[in-house]
Amino acid sequence: MTSSHNNLLQNFQEYLSVEKGLSDNSIYSYGYDLNKFKNFLEKEHIDFLKVQADDIMRFLNEEKDRKISSKTIAREVVAIRQFYKFLKDEKKLDTNPTEKIETPEVMRSIPDYLTQDEIEELFASIKEDNLYELRDKCIFELLYSSGLRISEACNLRLNDMDLEGMTLTVEGKGGRQRLVPFGEKSLDILNRYLKQSRPFILKSRNCEYLFVSKKGSYINRKSVWRLLNHYIKRTSILKKVTPHTLRHSFATHLLENHADLKSVQELLGHIDIATTQIYTHMANKTLREVHKKFHPRG
């Protein structure tokens, strides 16, 4: 049981790093809280994948009995909730056992994003005459111009593309499908990738996935994260940048240019518009900075 529990936790922490772009400290905090929960389950001989809401409540009540602070318990609930949401999205579970557990009030942090100038600097650092770099630029172009999650981009298959209609059929969290448009720049680099880069990398091998690795299979999330870090080092950008930062940038730039919130929600594949609303704070922050810089009463 311990080995399978550790594997699930490791997969979750990789997801937090690669897809959610959390800091090392945040990932450590999630891991610390979930290890406490894991130890409780193993003491009770309960498997992660067979947990019920009552089991979680017994763990939380034990924490209260040990005089653990309410702030720490609230953090533990968030960690457990996010972990089981991840397991459900990964189709390890049919239901999330935390759904009946009251969500504590916690402040959501505003995610980091790149400015439009920083996006251009990043893309300019990638050399399109190198066929591997052409592939990488194509991946980053879709992450930014279509707001894809890194897992969605890595899982794209050739038949998910409609080049004529300039759309992608994307399978998001929980197996939900959505149609995502892309623009002329994406179409141009996709065509060049398909004609030049992809055949060069595959070397006569077959693969159903759009983005391929040297091994002839699909490129994984961790590889894309490493590649993005490599290109960021070529720029003057000092922010921590992950593939998810490009998705944050996509949403922020749409709202800065007055896209309506409902449309952005649909493009991102969010079920709850409250998840999308966090980006309005980011856009409003930019507007405040413009006002302060350029208005005589700023």
From Swiss-Prot:
Checking InterPro entries in the record gives: CB, DNA_brk_join_enz, Integrase-like_cat_sf, Integrase_catalytic, Integrase_recombinase_N, Integrase_SAM-like_N, Recomb_XerD, Tyrosine_recombinase_XerC/XerD
Domain Core-binding (CB) positions: 3-88
One matching Pfam family, short form?
Phage_int_SAM_1
Which GO BP terms sit in this record? cell division; chromosome segregation; DNA recombination; DNA transposition; resolution of DNA recombination intermediates
Superkingdom per UniProt: Bacteria
> What broad class describes the main subcellular location of this protein?
cytoplasm
Keywords, A to Z?
Answer: Cell cycle, Cell division, Chromosome partition, Cytoplasm, DNA integration, DNA recombination, DNA-binding
Among its keywords, does the record have Secreted? no
**What GO terms are given for molecular function?**
DNA binding; tyrosine-based site-specific recombinase activity
One GO cellular component this record assigns the protein to is:
cytoplasm
Family matches, as PROSITE patterns: CB (PS51900), TYR_RECOMBINASE (PS51898)
Q: Which positions fall inside the Tyr recombinase domain?
A: 109-292
UniProt KW Cytoplasm keyword:
yes
What positions does UniProt annotate as the active site of this protein? R149, K173, H244, R247, H270, Y279
The protein's location, in the record's own words, is:
Cytoplasm
Alphabetical list of HAMAP family matching this protein: Recomb_XerC_XerD, Recomb_XerD
**Could you give the subunit structure recorded for this chain?**
Forms a cyclic heterotetrameric complex composed of two molecules of XerC and two molecules of XerD.
Task: Describe the task this protein carries out.
Answer: Site-specific tyrosine recombinase, which acts by catalyzing the cutting and rejoining of the recombining DNA molecules. The XerC-XerD complex is essential to convert dimers of the bacterial chromosome into monomers to permit their segregation at cell division. It also contributes to the segregational stability of plasmids.
| Family per record | Belongs to the 'phage' integrase family. XerD subfamily.
Q: What is this protein called?
A: Tyrosine recombinase XerD
